[in-house]
A protein has these predicted regions:
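Beta-strand-rich binding-surface signature
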Residues: 2-4, 11, 21-26, 58, ...
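Short secondary-structure boundary/capping segments
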Residues: 18-27, 104, 109-122, 166-172, ...
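Von Willebrand factor
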Residues: 1-99, 127-135, 161, ...
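Eukaryotic complex-assembly/interaction regions
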Residues: 1, 6, 20-22, 59, ...
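Acidic, polar loop-rich interaction surfaces within structured domains
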Residues: 130-226
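VWA/integrin I-like adhesion module and closely mimicked acidic/polar interface patches used
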Residues: 81-84, 92-94, 101-163, 186
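Short interface patches used for recognition in eukaryotic signaling and trafficking proteins
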Residues: 60-69, 108, 120-127, 148-154, ...
Length: 226
């Protein structure tokens, strides 16, 4: 099984993790309105082939992005990037996205903040409990077209519009957690998981357990994964 990694805020970073490298190489795509994969080789590799490079990348990501002050993030182009990666690799697989806030940056999949406490308990409440549009449903359908499924983990501590984002399905929901970067994992899951008031120091253990269980499911036995 091959794996790959991406990180993002308002841009998307792709990583060359070819085993022959001493360090992972990062390439950034800033124009996310016309998504493409910037590298032909090294984006997806087996863990056995690239274990040392992957370990190095996992150590570097918190150092590279721990102090980021980016306030607007994307999500739609990330899903499109994963789709394009699987398409370029000519393999089916699974895209695992860890996301933590409402995608409000100018890009495909941008959403409005509909958080309005005044409508709770009124007739208008149902308007914020239904999807804003069908964009994320369309993203999911495009992925299915190339044999790519999407697992979306949400780590939010503010309004994130689950009604709209959940159209990508399946969804894992972890509330009140701040997550500053996204990574590509092999996982699966067919139900919504909500972890309210999770303590950050316990998150890694619980999330690791969840992804291991998901990976062992029959749906994760594909040849590629982000």
């Amino acid at each position: 099984m091959r794996v790959g990694f991406m990180t993002y805020d308002s841009k998307i970073n792709f990583y060359n993790i070819k085993g022959a490298l001493t360090q992972p190489q990062m390439m950034t795509v800033g124009d996310v309105n016309d998504m493409f994969v910037p590298m032909a080789e090294g984006l997806m590799c087996t863990v056995e082939e690239s274990e040392a490079v992957i370990d190095s990348l996992m150590e570097q990501i918190p150092q590279m992005f721990g102090d980021t002050r980016e306030t607007e993030t994307i999500l739609g182009p990330v899903i499109q990037a994963g789709k394009e990666a699987f398409k370029a690799a000519g393999c089916a697989g699974k895209l695992i996205v860890f996301h933590h806030n409402l995608p409000v940056a100018e890009a495909p999949g941008k959403l409005k903040n509909r958080d309005d406490r005044k409508v709770l308990g009124t007739e208008k409440e149902k308007t914020v409990l239904t999807p804003q549009n069908k964009t994320y449903n369309e993203f999911g359908q495009e992925c299915v077209g190339v044999g790519c499924s999407v697992d979306l983990f949400l780590f939010n501590n503010a309004y994130i519009d689950v009604a709209t984002l959940s159209q990508v399905r399946p969804l894992q929901f972890c509330s009140h957690i701040t997550c500053d970067f996204m990574m590509y994992f092999i996982s699966s899951g067919l139900s919504t998981k909500w972890w309210p008031n999770v303590q950050v120091h316990l998150l890694s253990t619980r999330l690791r357990r969840r992804t291991i269980l998901s990976r062992s499911s029959s749906q994760s036995q594909s040849s590629c994964g982000f």
